[in-house]
């Protein structure tokens, strides 16, 4: 089972999102979490590496909604991810 953590920046970004955007992210996150467990991401989430940021990945949760994350080490079974940023496409400038 995957575990997750968030950066302070992610939490600050989260507070700036509208209620609608938060709901959109939650829907996408449920799909992401299931796909992570299955070992394959569906194309609609467009999970891919962020250019110029080795080890950082992005997930699309709305037409202009992005969330960035990285894989981290943990003891035990399953992956551990750290959510770094969330917001518009602009977050990719400082993922």
Language model regions located:
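A short, surface-exposed loop/turn module that caps and links secondary-structure elements
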Residues: 33-60
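Residues that form or immediately flank small-molecule/cofactor binding pockets and catalytic motifs
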Residues: 9, 52, 88
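Arg/Lys-rich, positively charged N-terminal/basic patches that mediate binding to nucleic acids
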Residues: 1-30
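Secondary-structure boundary motif
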Residues: 16-19, 34, 38, 74
């Amino acid at each position: 089972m995957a575990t997750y953590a968030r950066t302070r920046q992610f939490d600050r970004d989260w507070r700036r999102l509208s209620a609608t955007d938060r709901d959109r992210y939650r829907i996408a996150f449920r799909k992401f979490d299931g796909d992570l467990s299955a070992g394959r991401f569906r194309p609609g989430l467009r999970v891919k590496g962020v250019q110029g940021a080795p080890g950082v990945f992005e997930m699309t949760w709305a037409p202009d909604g992005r969330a960035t994350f990285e894989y981290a080490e943990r003891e035990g079974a399953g992956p551990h991810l750290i959510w770094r940023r969330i917001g518009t496409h602009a977050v990719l400038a400082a993922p």
